[in-house]
Protein backbone atom coordinates (compact mmCIF):
# COMPACT_ATOMS: atom_id res chain seq x y z
CA UNK A 1 0.00 0.00 0.00
CA UNK A 2 1.19 3.51 -0.79
CA UNK A 3 1.48 5.60 2.34
CA UNK A 4 1.52 9.40 2.22
CA UNK A 5 0.58 12.28 4.43
CA UNK A 6 -0.97 14.65 1.88
CA UNK A 7 -2.81 14.56 -1.43
CA UNK A 8 0.13 16.36 -3.06
CA UNK A 9 2.38 13.38 -2.33
CA UNK A 10 0.08 11.25 -4.47
CA UNK A 11 0.90 13.28 -7.58
CA UNK A 12 4.24 11.49 -7.97
CA UNK A 13 2.58 8.09 -7.67
CA UNK A 14 -0.07 9.12 -10.22
CA UNK A 15 2.54 10.40 -12.68
CA UNK A 16 4.49 7.15 -12.34
CA UNK A 17 1.36 5.10 -13.08
CA UNK A 18 1.20 3.57 -9.61
CA UNK A 19 -2.39 4.64 -8.98
CA UNK A 20 -5.75 4.52 -10.71
CA UNK A 21 -7.58 7.82 -10.19
CA UNK A 22 -11.37 7.98 -10.50
CA UNK A 23 -13.34 11.23 -10.25
CA UNK A 24 -16.96 11.36 -9.13
CA UNK A 25 -19.79 13.88 -8.72
CA UNK A 26 -22.71 13.13 -6.46
CA UNK A 27 -25.73 15.13 -5.39
CA UNK A 28 -28.91 14.52 -3.43
CA UNK A 29 -32.04 13.33 -5.18
CA UNK A 30 -33.88 16.65 -5.54
CA UNK A 31 -37.31 15.00 -5.48
CA UNK A 32 -36.66 13.08 -2.25
CA UNK A 33 -34.27 15.51 -0.56
CA UNK A 34 -34.65 16.02 3.17
CA UNK A 35 -32.47 17.97 5.58
CA UNK A 36 -29.72 15.69 6.81
CA UNK A 37 -29.07 13.98 3.44
CA UNK A 38 -25.57 12.53 3.68
CA UNK A 39 -22.96 10.62 1.68
CA UNK A 40 -19.82 8.58 2.30
CA UNK A 41 -17.95 5.62 0.83
CA UNK A 42 -17.46 2.23 2.40
CA UNK A 43 -13.77 1.58 3.03
CA UNK A 44 -13.98 -1.82 1.36
CA UNK A 45 -14.84 -0.30 -2.06
CA UNK A 46 -12.69 -1.81 -4.80
CA UNK A 47 -12.07 -1.82 -8.52
CA UNK A 48 -11.76 -4.95 -10.62
CA UNK A 49 -10.70 -5.46 -14.23
CA UNK A 50 -13.75 -6.88 -16.00
CA UNK A 51 -13.62 -10.62 -16.46
CA UNK A 52 -11.33 -11.18 -13.47
CA UNK A 53 -11.72 -11.77 -9.75
CA UNK A 54 -8.86 -9.38 -8.91
CA UNK A 55 -9.94 -6.79 -6.34
CA UNK A 56 -7.87 -3.64 -5.95
CA UNK A 57 -8.80 -1.87 -2.72
CA UNK A 58 -9.15 1.80 -1.93
CA UNK A 59 -5.89 3.63 -1.20
CA UNK A 60 -7.28 7.12 -0.55
CA UNK A 61 -10.62 8.92 -0.62
CA UNK A 62 -10.21 12.64 -1.28
CA UNK A 63 -13.03 15.08 -0.42
CA UNK A 64 -15.45 12.38 0.76
CA UNK A 65 -15.53 10.68 4.15
CA UNK A 66 -15.06 6.96 4.61
CA UNK A 67 -17.80 5.26 6.66
CA UNK A 68 -18.78 5.63 9.40
CA UNK A 69 -18.03 9.35 8.90
CA UNK A 70 -20.57 11.26 6.78
CA UNK A 71 -20.73 14.39 4.66
CA UNK A 72 -24.04 16.24 5.06
CA UNK A 73 -25.33 18.19 2.07
CA UNK A 74 -26.26 21.80 2.79
CA UNK A 75 -29.14 21.83 0.30
CA UNK A 76 -30.79 19.82 -2.48
CA UNK A 77 -28.76 21.50 -5.23
CA UNK A 78 -25.29 21.00 -3.78
CA UNK A 79 -22.84 18.78 -5.67
CA UNK A 80 -19.92 16.97 -4.10
CA UNK A 81 -16.87 16.38 -6.28
CA UNK A 82 -14.54 13.72 -4.94
CA UNK A 83 -11.75 11.43 -6.04
CA UNK A 84 -10.94 7.82 -5.18
CA UNK A 85 -7.45 6.40 -5.59
CA UNK A 86 -6.76 2.70 -6.15
CA UNK A 87 -3.65 0.66 -7.03
CA UNK A 88 -2.63 0.65 -10.68
CA UNK A 89 -4.58 -1.65 -12.96
CA UNK A 90 -2.86 -4.31 -15.05
CA UNK A 91 -1.66 -3.06 -18.43
CA UNK A 92 -4.21 -3.64 -21.15
CA UNK A 93 -7.27 -3.27 -18.89
CA UNK A 94 -10.08 -1.86 -21.04
CA UNK A 95 -13.07 -1.95 -18.64
CA UNK A 96 -13.47 -2.05 -14.87
CA UNK A 97 -16.11 -2.62 -12.25
CA UNK A 98 -16.23 -0.21 -9.31
CA UNK A 99 -17.87 -2.02 -6.43
CA UNK A 100 -18.81 -0.64 -3.05
CA UNK A 101 -20.93 -3.61 -2.02
CA UNK A 102 -20.89 -6.75 -4.18
CA UNK A 103 -24.28 -8.14 -5.19
CA UNK A 104 -26.24 -5.41 -3.41
CA UNK A 105 -29.08 -3.46 -4.97
CA UNK A 106 -29.21 -1.08 -2.01
CA UNK A 107 -29.87 2.47 -3.17
CA UNK A 108 -26.99 4.89 -2.78
CA UNK A 109 -24.06 2.57 -3.38
CA UNK A 110 -21.21 3.38 -5.74
CA UNK A 111 -21.53 0.26 -7.89
CA UNK A 112 -20.62 0.82 -11.53
CA UNK A 113 -20.08 -2.07 -13.93
CA UNK A 114 -18.19 -2.31 -17.23
CA UNK A 115 -16.87 1.25 -17.08
CA UNK A 116 -14.57 1.90 -20.06
CA UNK A 117 -11.06 2.91 -19.08
CA UNK A 118 -11.29 5.57 -21.78
CA UNK A 119 -13.93 7.28 -19.62
CA UNK A 120 -11.84 6.94 -16.44
CA UNK A 121 -8.72 8.23 -18.20
CA UNK A 122 -10.61 11.20 -19.68
CA UNK A 123 -11.08 12.62 -16.19
CA UNK A 124 -14.82 13.05 -16.73
CA UNK A 125 -16.45 12.37 -13.35
CA UNK A 126 -18.78 9.42 -12.89
CA UNK A 127 -22.16 10.50 -11.55
CA UNK A 128 -24.53 8.97 -9.09
CA UNK A 129 -27.68 10.77 -8.04
Q: Language model features by range: what are they?
A:
Residues 1-17, 52-65:
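Low-complexity, acidic Ser/Thr/Pro/Gly-rich terminal tails and inter-domain linkers that flank the onset
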Residues 9-20, 70-76:
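Short, solvent-exposed beta-strand/turn "edge" segments of beta-rich domains on protein surfaces
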Residues 16, 49-54, 87-94:
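A short, structured loop/turn motif at beta-sheet edges
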Residues 18-30:
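Short, well-ordered beta-strand segments enriched in hydrophobic/aromatic residues
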Residues 28-34, 92:
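Primarily extracytoplasmic ectodomains and periplasmic/lumenal surface modules that are beta-strand-rich
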Residues 34-71:
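The feature marks short-to-medium sequence segments in extracytoplasmic or secretory-pathway proteins
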Residues 59-97, 103:
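Short, solvent-exposed, Trp/other aromatic-anchored flexible loops in extracytoplasmic proteins
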Residues 102-129:
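Internal interaction segment
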Amino acid sequence: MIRTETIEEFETHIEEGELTVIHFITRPNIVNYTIGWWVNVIGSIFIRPCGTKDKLGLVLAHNIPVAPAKYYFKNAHEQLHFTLFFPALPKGTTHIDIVEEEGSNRIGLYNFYRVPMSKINSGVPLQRH
